[in-house]
Structures are given as structure tokens and as C-alpha cells.
Design a protein with these regions (language model features):
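Short, basic alpha-helical/linker "hinge" immediately adjacent to a nucleic-acid-recognition surface
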Residues: 1-4, 21, 30-85
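Residue-level signal for the short linker/turn that defines the boundary of a DNA-recognition helix
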Residues: 14, 27-28, 92, 109
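Mobile genetic element proteins and their domesticated derivatives, centered on retroelements
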Residues: 19, 33, 44-47, 55, ...
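Basic, flexible linker segments flanking DNA-binding modules
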Residues: 55-150, 155, 224-235, 313-320
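Mobile-element integrase/transposase regions
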Residues: 107-108, 119-177, 184-206, 241-246, ...
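Acidic/histidine-rich, metal-coordinating catalytic segments
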Residues: 200-232, 257
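Charged alpha-helix within mobile-element recombinases
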Residues: 233, 239-309, 314-326
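C-terminal, beta-rich DNA-binding module of retroviral/retroelements integrases
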Residues: 297-388
């Protein structure tokens, strides 16, 4: 059994340890780690192996004569084992458990020492839920906001048998989570909320990379023959596609799940970590989860994101004349009759003048947009006027 090691690390050693941790967790490549640390890839591989075997202690010079501050006691070992077996931490993988011990129990222990304790106690680290075989990684984009990967994943996030859909977006250049939003099922509203949160916090991205789900791409898109395309035939945008056009965002449908490798790896990490974080925070409902995720994203990004090659952001500021609520919604066209009445879902609705709006109601046979969103219900847009 190795002794518990509490080493005082220099800033340089600490920086190396943080970068190597990202490498070991699979969030950056050897090449990226080498560039960040200004070392050769061969040297980085040696450091990675050493840290995996010995933890942070490996980064201390072997001849420094730096001794551990104290050795393990039986009571300390029993405490570690007891905590790992507790309902709070039992589902945490070993690396996450090491971090949680420091964050919530004020216990620092090297990964290798922790591994030895738990291994001898017959405790195994939960296996990663790898959805796809690893593939060669595509080079990151150079700037934040150039390309956003977006997806949703159903999972038992609350530790029950019920699955909920976590919608999310990750920046390709930095690996930074831009937003997360959970709903009962994968849906348009969930994706609209993700985009809304991104734009409010960062701005409008240049492009969004998605799968070929019907939310993003019309099911008729694949039915167009070459002759149809040459003849100029097109298919209607989905509601999401229409909204992205209004915002000037290029929507790029991926050809395979492997093409969205960064967000697929994000889901693996979150499926391992987030249920444990929810349990510690007492999160049990969708509303509680969405409130918690706002703070969790910052914590996650501090640990796992990387610096972009180009520090200039590609996000664009939202123009003052664009109301996100009237863009990120279901928008359908209708025609009104003499009494400013239109039909929707086999029901008739009458447009009323706004109390604070002197605009004239749409005349007969006018084309209007009906806006539908869980946040505000139903609104009507006629030219530039919105009727509640």
C-alpha cells in the first residue's frame, strides 16, 4: 500500500497536472497537450503514463527528497471505503470520486493511492458508457463560435428508471459547454432553449452541427432526386431550420454520429458524472435540474475546456431589432376573416387589440404568423406588430 501523498506543487507543476488530467480524461489530444505545455509529444506521453500510475506525485523530481506529510491510517482507509460505498458516491467513477472528496469532504488523495485503496477493497469503477467506437479526431475550429455541435441524449439523469432528454451544445474550438437544457423527451422546445441560452450569454454562432433528426432536417430532403435538385425543387425548412435562417446561422447536418465526436464524448462524461452531481445537490425534478445546470456548466468548463487557437470570438451580437422569443418558436401562417379571426388546431381564435398598441387589426384575407411557444403560449404577428 502506498502512502497518502500531500505534495506542495509549483505553479508550473500544477499547470502540467491540469493539462495532463484533461488528456487522460480524453478531452484533449496528445498534440494539443504538447502545444499547451510547450513539450514534445513523446515527453507528454511519458508524463501521461507517469501521472496515470503515480498521480500528481510523479511530477515532483525524484531527487527532491520531498516526503509525504503523513501516512495512511486504518481509520482513514475505512473512511475512504465507507464514503465510496455510501449512497451519495457509490455511482461515481474513481476519477470523479477523487475530485468530489476534495470538493465536498476536504480530502486530497492521489489517484493512484485512491485506486489502490478501492481496488484492495474489491470496489470497481463504473464502466464508461461508450456509445461509439473511437475515431480519429478532426482538427478543432480556430475560433469560439465558428462551429457549435448540438445534440440531445436520453438517460436516467435522476437515478430512477425514468429517462429524460438532456439537450446541449458544445463549442468545437474550446470543448466548452455553451448550454444544457433538460426536458422529458427530445423536442424542438429543448433545442430552442439551448440556442436562446447560447445567444444571450455568448452571441450568435456562425454555424451549428446537428444530426439528421426530423427536428433539424425535413424528412423529404433525402427524397429529392438529382433531377429534382437540378430543376430547382426544394423542401420546406423545419421550424428549427427556419429559425436558424432568420438568425443567420448556417445549419450543417452530420452524415454520421461519429462526425459529432466532441459532443458524443461530452455525453459519455456527463452520463458518468451528472447523476452523481444531481444526487449531491438534491436535484430531483426538471426545473431543479435546469437551475442547477447553469452553475454546473461553469464548473465543468473550468476543468475540461481548452483555449482556442485564435482568441478572437466569432460570435455575433444579437441585433437590437430581433426578439428571440418571436424567432425561437413555432411559426405558422394563417389567413384572417372579417372579424380578425383565424383557425388553429380546429379551433377559432380572435385577434384583440393590445391595450398599449394603437395598431389596426389585420384586415380581411391578411396573412398572419401565429407564434407558439410554451413560454408565452400563442401570439400573432402581422407585419411588424405582435398581438398577445
Amino acid at each position: 500500500m502506498k502512502n497518502e501523498v500531500h505534495y506542495l506543487m509549483s505553479q508550473k507543476q500544477l499547470n502540467r497536472f491540469l493539462v495532463l488530467t484533461k488528456l487522460i480524461d480524453g478531452h484533449i489530444t496528445v498534440k494539443e497537450a504538447a502545444e499547451s505545455l510547450n513539450l514534445s509529444e513523446r515527453h507528454v506521453k511519458r508524463l501521461k503514463k507517469g501521472v496515470m500510475n503515480e498521480g500528481a506525485a510523479f511530477l515532483k523530481h525524484k531527487n527532491s527528497n520531498h516526503k509525504p506529510l503523513h501516512a495512511f491510517s486504518d481509520s482513514f482507509i475505512e473512511k475512504i471505503i465507507s464514503l465510496k460505498k455510501s449512497d451519495t458516491y457509490k455511482d461515481a467513477n474513481f476519477k470523479h470520486f477523487q475530485e468530489l472528496l476534495l470538493e465536498h469532504e476536504s480530502i486530497y488523495i492521489s489517484y493512484s493511492a485512491l485506486y489502490e485503496i478501492l481496488k484492495k477493497a474489491g470496489i470497481k469503477s463504473p464502466k464508461k458508457r461508450r456509445r461509439f467506437k473511437p475515431h480519429r479526431r478532426r482538427k478543432r475550429k480556430s475560433q469560439e463560435g465558428l462551429l457549435i455541435q448540438m445534440d440531445a441524449t436520453p438517460f436516467e439523469w435522476f437515478g430512477t428508471n425514468d429517462k429524460f432528454a438532456l439537450h446541449g451544445a458544445i463549442d468545437d474550438a474550446t470543448g466548452k459547454i455553451l448550454s444544457l437544457y433538460i426536458t422529458k423527451n427530445e423536442c424542438l422546445h429543448g433545442y430552442f432553449e439551448v440556442v436562446k441560452l447560447i445567444i444571450i450569454k455568448f452571441g450568435i454562432p456562425v454555424s451549428i452541427y446537428t444530426d439528421r433528426h426530423a427536428i433539424f432536417l425535413s424528412t423529404n430532403a433525402s427524397k429529392l432526386s438529382i433531377e429534382d435538385q437540378l430543376a430547382g425543387k426544394i423542401v420546406n425548412d423545419t421550424q428549427f431550420g427556419r429559425a436558424m435562417k432568420e438568425l443567420g446561422i448556417t445549419l450543417i447536418p452530420a452524415r454520421s454520429p461519429q462526425a459529432k465526436g466532441r459532443i458524443e464524448r461530452l455525453w459519455e462524461t456527463l452520463q458518468s458524472r451528472l447523476p452523481v452531481e444531481f444526487k449531491i445537490a438534491g436535484v430531483k425534478t426538471i426545473d431543479e435540474a435546469n437551475a442547477f445546470l447553469a452553475t454546473y456548466i461553469s464548473k465543468f468548463n473550468q476543468q475540461f475546456s481548452v483555449e482556442p487557437e485564435d482568441t478572437e470570438s466569432a460570435f455575433r451580437e444579437l441585433p437590437n431589432d430581433i426578439d428571440l422569443n418571436t424567432v425561437l418558436c413555432v411559426k405558422v401562417t394563417r389567413t384572417v376573416d372579417n372579424g380578425a379571426v383565424f383557425s388553429l388546431y380546429n379551433k377559432s381564435f380572435k385577434i384583440l387589440e393590445n391595450n398599449n398598441n394603437s395598431s389596426i387589426l389585420p384586415p380581411r384575407k391578411s396573412r398572419i404568423y401565429v407564434l407558439i411557444n410554451p413560454a408565452f403560449g400563442i401570439k400573432v404577428q402581422y407585419e411588424k406588430t405582435i398581438f398577445d
